[in-house]
Amino acid sequence: MATYNGECWIEEQLKSIIEQKDVDISIFISDDLSTDNTLNICEEFQLSYPSIINILPSVNKFGGAGKNFYRLIKDVDLENYDYICFSDQDDIWYKDKIKNAIDCLVFNNANCYSSNVIAYYPSGRKNLVDKAQSQTQFDYFFEAAGPGCTYVIKKETLIEFKKFIINNKNAAQDICLHDWFLYSFARTRNYSWYIDRKPTMLYRQHENNQVGANISFKAKYKRLGLVRNKWYRKEVTKIANALADDSFVNNQLGKGYIGNLILALSFWKLRRKKADKIYILLMLILNIF
């Protein structure tokens, strides 16, 4: 669990993890030098659940959830666990979240798992966030498998990712979104990934979300800005370069508008959701990407 100034929500988040059914868990927390009461709340939980909760020593400022999660992956000894989950600080997990994920991994003989979620707003409004469309040939270059807080990964797979980010420190640290990067790593290394249609948690939405659900007009407008200012393209390129991928996509990224037009000819292979396929087609043709 990566935390930063989450005092309003972290107690509910921790309770929902501790109350998971039919699994034995350990929680490792890395706090990014919070300036509110987050760390104190975590320490109080640690006193109540000393065999479950472990708080990593505070080090330098990470400045974002991605680098904080990279720190957790590198510093936690993964060998003693069968499966590893990522947790945000502000969500509510359904009580069977982890057990359901493990059952799906076993039944489908998969290495990695993610799921749909229910976006949960301060007003009480709820919306399904559907990420479970069929995976495409190159979707992993352009999107994550879903919210990282739904990821459940077999130990052996995450250990390989851990080795990779340790051996490629500079490249890995430069990639903002750990969940997108892990999905790309898994797919390029032929690890099987199962995306569950069943929602497994309430995905809390508030003004401090680093990413959040892409449902509202405001959220969509914000993400359009990330495409227009080339942040999105830069992240795609950094992931492709870090993974030393020699695919069709990577070969087009350095060709400017010509490369965009070539990618546009295979637009249906670049995203999972139909609307997102059309969206990226337009971004490529209009040279916004």
Swiss-Prot record:
Pfam families: Glycos_transf_2. GO terms for molecular function: hexosyltransferase activity. Keywords: Glycosyltransferase, Lipopolysaccharide biosynthesis, Transferase. Its EC number is 2.4.-.-. It comes from the Bacteria. It is an enzyme of class 2 (transferase). Pathway: Bacterial outer membrane biogenesis; lipopolysaccharide biosynthesis. GO terms for biological process: lipopolysaccharide biosynthetic process. The keyword Transferase applies. InterPro entries: Glyco_trans_2-like, Nucleotide-diphossugar_trans. Belongs to the glycosyltransferase 2 family. This is dTDP-rhamnosyl transferase RfbG. The gene is rfbG.
